[in-house]
């Protein structure tokens, strides 16, 4: 089936295509993926204070750095691609993209580098909220405006105070991880068979979205379905390869897995790949003997739904996140608003077999899926 081939191709390609370093807008040069690109000289932007905002507004080009968490994370790769596209719409913004490669030390080093290179504004996608929070604070202390995105960095991440407000001095553009996971969890209450055995794939420990999505499954599914048995649960860190390895080991027990509960589409895809050729899970006619739930609504996830392998996902639109990030970055840099006034969230609509064609068409239109690959 062509869709199976497409899913496999996306699984391997998504990690490489979007995370190449970028410099968009203002005619900038390409940046190195693993470290911040060399910066041009320029005055630091401010936190939106009136007199400093007026000074910032006089610059011809603003240098913005997006620090993504990992190139192997298909959503982070998608978000990077969309950041480049959104930045291209602003003539006075030069965007540099770098990746922390799912390593806290690497990402923290990149955040320190943003201070050294005096970026005018930094957009941070943390790998581990608590690990990155002190370095986000260093950026704000240096007078560099910071927007945290996917996930938000909270005050509690810095000081353990239990204060879940946005980290002091920063702004955020995000999605609600509880609402995202609630989409699949509520469906699963009705769909998962009685006394089912399920496996749970978790994102990185300490990551706000990973933890809150898992909490949502407790609230909206496991508390309602006490008959369900969690056969295995482990951290696959948003990574499809790690999920594939875990699933290959789990099915060796011989106990049938009735449902895959994954905190993102990428891990779900890896687990599905592990059982794709197993007749206990996929029949000769392509129908399945398992359910699978994801989050993110990636092109890969949509194709798996179309194929009948993924039951549903919740869209976390990287396009919307990127557009909002760049819109607010522009307003802050041009002195139109304070960084602390940036507080916006995107919706999480459900994608399932009934409406997946609508979302696949979006990916065809933006080039992430080709019409030829779909056989159209």
What are these regions (language model features)?
Residues 58-61, 201-209, 220, 224-227, ...:
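Hinge/cleft segment of the Venus flytrap/periplasmic-binding protein
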Residues 75-89, 180-184, 208-228, 242, ...:
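Short, solvent-exposed amphipathic alpha-helices that sit
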Residues 134-179, 298-306, 311:
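Flexible loop/hinge segments that line or gate small-molecule binding clefts
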């Amino acid at each position: 089936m062509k869709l199976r081939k497409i899913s496999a191709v996306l699984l391997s390609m998504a990690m490489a295509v979007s995370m190449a370093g970028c410099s968009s807008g203002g005619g900038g040069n390409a940046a190195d993926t693993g470290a911040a690109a060399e910066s041009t000289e320029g005055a630091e932007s401010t936190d939106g204070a009136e007199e400093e905002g007026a000074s910032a507004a006089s610059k011809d080009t603003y240098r913005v750095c997006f620090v993504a968490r990992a190139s192997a994370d298909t959503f982070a790769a998608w978000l990077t691609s969309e950041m480049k596209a959104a930045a291209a719409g602003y003539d006075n913004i030069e965007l540099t993209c770098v990746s922390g490669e799912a390593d806290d030390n690497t990402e923290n080093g990149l955040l320190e580098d943003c201070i050294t290179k005096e970026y005018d504004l930094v957009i941070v996608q943390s790998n581990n909220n608590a690990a990155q929070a002190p370095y986000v604070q260093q950026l704000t202390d240096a007078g560099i405006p910071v927007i945290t995105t996917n996930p938000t960095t909270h005050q509690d991440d810095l000081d353990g105070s239990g204060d879940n407000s946005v980290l002091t001095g920063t702004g955020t553009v995000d999605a609600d991880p509880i609402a995202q996971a609630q989409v699949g969890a509520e469906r699963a209450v009705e769909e998962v068979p009685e006394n089912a055995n399920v496996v749970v794939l978790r994102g990185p420990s300490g990551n706000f979205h990973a933890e809150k999505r898992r909490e949502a499954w407790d609230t909206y599914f496991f508390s309602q379905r006490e008959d369900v048995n969690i056969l295995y649960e482990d951290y696959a860190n948003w990574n499809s390869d790690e999920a594939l390895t875990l699933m290959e080991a789990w099915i060796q027990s011989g106990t049938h897995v009735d449902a895959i509960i994954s905190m993102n589409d990428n891990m779900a895809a890896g687990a599905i790949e592990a059982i794709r050729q197993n007749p206990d899970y996929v029949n000769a006619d392509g129908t399945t003997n398992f359910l699978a739930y994801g989050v993110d609504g990636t092109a890969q996830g949509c194709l798996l739904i179309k194929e009948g392998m993924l039951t549903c996902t919740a869209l976390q639109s990287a396009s919307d996140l990127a557009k909002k990030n760049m819109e607010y970055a522009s307003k802050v840099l041009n002195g139109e608003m304070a960084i602390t006034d940036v507080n916006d969230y995107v919706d999480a609509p459900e994608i399932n077999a009934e409406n997946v064609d609508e979302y696949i068409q979006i990916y065809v239109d933006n080039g992430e899926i080709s019409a030829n690959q779909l056989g159209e």
